[in-house]
Amino acid sequence: MLKIIIPTAMLMPMTCLSKPNMIWINSTTYSLLISLISLSYLNQLGGHSLNFSLLFFSDSLSAPLLVLTTWLLPLMLMASQSHLSKETPSRKKLYITMLTLLQLLLIMTFTATELIMFYILFEATLIPTLIIITRWGDQTERLNAGLYFLFYTLVGSLPLLVALLYIQNTTGTLNFLIIQYWAKPISTTWSNIFLWLACMMAFMVKMPLYGLHLWLPKAHVEAPIAGSMVLAAVLLKLGGYGMMRITVLLNPATNQMAYPFMMLSLWGMVMTSSICLRQTDLKSLIAYSSVSHMALVIVAVLIQTPWSYMGATALMIAHGLTSSMLFCLANSNYERVHSRTMILARGLQTILPLMAAWWLLASLANLALPPTINLIGELFVVMASFSWSNMTIILMGTNIIITALYSLYMLIMTQRGKYTHHIKNINPSFTRENALMALHLLPLLLLSLNPKIVLGPIY
């Protein structure tokens, strides 16, 4: 485990000691090397977990998320270069240090064995994210967005700490590896219902569940590009990962308690997709589409069948790469047009044909076209929910149609139509941006050749 944690920690002093003209080159190449080392975790034998020590372990659920986390740091650094070109070197170094610190905390969160340690790290990821949003965001509303983000997540996860201390007292351990054998079945008495809610609410807010999702569009819209990328790609996955880990302790209460939340998710999935059709702000549209995709993951985790778990894991990885790519594309538009409003940036296909190709591929990945891993995840979730209840197919089908509609709407609004006069003399697409898009899309396509490495612990 230390072969990733120590190099990531040493990224911080390396950034601080780099010469001003070498900051980006050093940090990007070094973080790419770290992400290549982390690939060794994917090749695990059967369903066994790699127990690195008493503190860290990795199994087939956390390994794909771990690799996604490390893979995202070089991409975030590549995406942030022109956004930070006006800043002083010390500010750039601080920014990279924040991203590295965030990656370090996320790696430790995904591999922690103790639930209390998981909780502390889960909360600690708020701090660098908050600093990134409130310091480098574009508009003045970023402070408001940061407050929303902080308080939603904190208030949601405080009861979790109380619940964890209670479980520690009753079972005597909070170690993931031991507690699955020691956990006593939880019946549906009133006290256990509150215990269930306390355990799940933190992750429901983080996912986010429809109704608790108001912080997400705000935080996404106001964050700088790297903030949006890491928020969409990894921080939302913390919720899904935590839910999968903690449902082991909460059976059989989950079977009764899951119904209202599944209804809310299925309804919210259709609602947020419909909200996407009415958006004028590009980043806001992508943020709402994230909510609708993560609602599928909530449904899958609460169904608790092997298929739904596999679908949830695959969908989390796929959504991480897809939404991150869409945010990068939105950012490349923003850097040229200096507005997130879609009407002001229409007709870009005639000026930037290669970017239009990336837009098309990203939109197709977002609506789960066959060769991508998105399809595998969505197919598993839809089939699992259909076998749970036949009625869900109505909502799932509606959601899939609306997803196709808003993806088409996004593509037509930004790429087609008559271009406006103020974008005649914009910059061409850089090699850096094309490489960034390719590095997002390649894993999505290559994983479909061998999807079992992202299908989680049950496969």
Curated annotation (Swiss-Prot):
Keywords: Electron transport, Membrane, Mitochondrion, Mitochondrion inner membrane, NAD, Respiratory chain, Translocase, Transmembrane, Transmembrane helix, Transport, Ubiquinone. It is an enzyme of class 7 (translocase). InterPro entries: NADH4_N, NADH_Q_OxRdtase_chainM/4, NADH_UbQ_OxRdtase, ND/Mrp_TM. The keyword Ligase does not apply. It catalyses: a ubiquinone + NADH + 5 H(+)(in) = a ubiquinol + NAD(+) + 4 H(+)(out). It is a multi-pass membrane protein. Its EC number is 7.1.1.2. Core subunit of the mitochondrial membrane respiratory chain NADH dehydrogenase (Complex I) which catalyzes electron transfer from NADH through the respiratory chain, using ubiquinone as an electron acceptor. Essential for the catalytic activity and assembly of complex I. PANTHER family: NADH-UBIQUINONE OXIDOREDUCTASE CHAIN 4. Belongs to the complex I subunit 4 family. This is NADH-ubiquinone oxidoreductase chain 4. It comes from Felis catus.
